[in-house]
């Protein structure tokens, strides 16, 4: 009898029973074993929020939909799962709601000091972008935007048609801040001693004025210089 008992002990030691850690766990056991409270000692910043009813339901549905549609994007899967969740009734949602309550109670028990703090996304300040006011400064009065090497051919090409007597002083090549505001045209005067100019101007106004008219225009035709306006 002693020999048989020793042989059974040796056989038992050679073939130990499978440990519980190697056995497949259900979803609840996996969640419990993988919870931060079971591992212990995690800071509160790394603790995740407890799942709600939709997350409990979609954790299985998402995996199935991803297997059926491997090329579907994750955002599209979430959109379809949200539409399906809205179509479910209260009776169908009840087991997932109860499971979410159980997870919330255990999360509160494991982390009594936990408080949800949403992380703010850091806004990257874009450097190198020139403000519009600085860029448009050269366009306002034609300052350094055109540059000194801007020729008259480029100016005529940019401004369209250029008349033959177009002054090159107003082209962008020499366009400075002093030309931002146009100056008033100077009145043109003719010499009083030239009888040809007076003779050409008088007949043009004679049909419109009577000989007996005492308007100030008659006095201007007598010999005073008359400004020429723009036609």
Swiss-Prot record:
GO CC annotations on file: cytoplasm; nucleus; transcription regulator complex
Subunit structure, interactors included: Interacts with HAND1; the interaction enhances HAND1-induced differentiation of trophoblast giant cells. Interacts with POU5F1 (OCT3/4); binds synergistically with POU5F1 to DNA. Interacts with FHL3; the interaction recruits the transcriptional coactivator FHL3 to the FOXK1 promoter.
Organism expressing this protein natively: Mus musculus
Function, as annotated: Transcription factor that binds to DNA at the 5'-AACAATG-3' consensus sequence. Acts as a transcriptional activator and repressor. Binds synergistically with POU5F1 (OCT3/4) to gene promoters. Binds to the FOXK1 promoter and recruits FHL3, resulting in transcriptional activation of FOXK1 which leads to myoblast proliferation. Acts as an inhibitor of myoblast differentiation via transcriptional repression which leads to down-regulation of the muscle-specific genes MYOD and MYOG. Involved in trophoblast giant cell differentiation via enhancement of HAND1 transcriptional activity.
This protein's name: Transcription factor SOX-15
Gene: Sox15
Residues with Phosphoserine modification: 35
Keyword flag Membrane: no
Comp. bias regions, Polar residues: 1-11, 211-221
Residue span of region Interaction with FHL3: 136-181
Subcellular localization: Nucleus
Annotated consequence of substituting residue 224 to S: In strain: various strains
Disruption phenotype: Knockout mice are viable, morphologically normal and fertile. Reduced regeneration of damaged skeletal muscle fibers following injury with increased numbers of mononuclear cells and a significant reduction in the number of myofibers. Impaired proliferation of myogenic progenitor cells, reduced number of satellite cells within the tibialis anterior muscles, and a decrease in FOXK1 expression.
Required to promote HAND1 transcriptional activator activity as annotated region, ranges: 1-45
Source organism phylogeny: Eukaryota, Metazoa, Chordata, Craniata, Vertebrata
